[in-house]
């Protein structure tokens, strides 16, 4: 099983824009407690505890899938192909999001992303 945050919008730019603040708040809160210890540094080695990653770093490390339904589906498909993924838990709610946004993200994932994954 894998847990990954998602932000699905009609365009990559809009998804990035709507994910940034919530992502940054999430990591300001949890980064100091070592939650980022799974991130890899530029040297290919795990980073030390306390990293507060940028949205770009999280996207590069694929801890959050951001983009259009097609782009998010490509990220899920990559995990499935690389890891033989059978179960995926999505984290559809970023700090500051209203409840309705989480519901929207779950609905979009099921109706727009899942059908694109083989």
Segments the model singles out, each with a brief description of its role:
Residues 9-11, 96-99:
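Flexible loop/turn segments at secondary-structure boundaries
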Residues 1-85:
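An alpha-helical appendage that flanks or caps ligand/catalytic pockets
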């Amino acid at each position: 099983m894998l847990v990954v945050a998602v932000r699905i919008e009609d365009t990559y730019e809009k998804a990035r824009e709507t994910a940034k603040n919530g992502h940054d708040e999430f990591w300001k809160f949890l980064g100091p407690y070592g939650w980022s210890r799974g991130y890899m540094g530029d040297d290919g080695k795990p980073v030390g505890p306390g990293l507060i990653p940028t949205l770009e770093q999280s996207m590069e490390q694929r801890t959050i899938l951001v983009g259009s339904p097609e782009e998010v589906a490509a990220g899920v498909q990559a995990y499935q192909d690389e890891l033989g993924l059978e179960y995926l838990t999505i984290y559809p709610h970023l700090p500051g999001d209203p409840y309705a946004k989480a519901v929207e993200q779950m609905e979009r994932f099921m109706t727009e992303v899942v059908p694109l994954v083989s």
